[in-house]
Regions:
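Catalytic donor nucleotide-activated moiety binding site of glycosyltransferases and closely related
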Residues: 34-39, 44-81
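Glycine-rich loops and low-complexity Gly/Arg-rich segments
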Residues: 56-60, 115-118, 133-136
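Flexible, charged surface loops at secondary-structure boundaries
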Residues: 23-28, 58-62, 82-86
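Donor nucleotide-activated moiety binding/catalytic core segment of transferases
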Residues: 63-108, 113-115
């Protein structure tokens, strides 16, 4: 559920949204794909998610697909900001980087386990003007902040009360 939440829990760096970059004429040359780790895919019984996605996405775009796996310990990935700078869209199963992409104005296609799900487009929207319609990014980000809690908020009941409100409404 997407609720109206104040920005009192939203960090300052997430309050400054960059201009929206969606639409078929946006010059991003790649579709940046953020697959989950193997244990994560296995836990959700989605072990073939990346393979299915790569075969399906080509029906909707001719752009290059850039796959950014989670960096392994001791391994280095290209800088996130440089990869995002060339992205026409970001596709994520459940990565928090999808929120960063939204903040930076890049459209996201997210699956149900992703914090950016409420601002998600569909694969069919790639290379169409549907991506020009900016989601309510501020509302989505503020809402996400009410799904994360500090230890004392579990002790004082705020986490439970807020979780029930998130699930069932007030």
């Amino acid at each position: 559920r997407l609720l109206d939440r104040p920005n009192d829990r939203t960090p300052e760096e997430l309050r400054h949204l960059q201009p929206w970059k969606g639409g078929k004429n946006w010059g991003g040359e790649n579709i940046l794909i953020l697959p989950p780790s193997l244990p994560y895919m296995d836990a959700f019984e989605e072990i073939n998610w990346l393979n299915k996605l790569c075969h399906t996405i080509n029906e909707f775009t001719g752009r290059n697909l850039v796959i950014r796996p989670k960096p392994a310990k001791g391994k280095k990935a290209p800088p996130w900001d440089s990869q995002l700078a060339t992205a026409a869209a970001v596709v994520s199963f459940g990565s928090n980087l999808a929120i960063d992409a939204m903040v930076k104005g890049v459209p996201t296609i997210s699956y149900k386990y992703c914090p950016a799900f409420f601002g998600s487009f569909k694969l069919e929207d790639l290379d169409t003007d549907a991506l020009m319609e900016e989601p309510d990014r501020e509302k989505i980000i503020n809402n996400c902040m009410y799904h994360s809690f500090h230890k004392h908020e579990f002790n004082n009941g705020f986490a439970w009360e807020t979780s029930m409100e998130n699930a069932y409404g007030s």
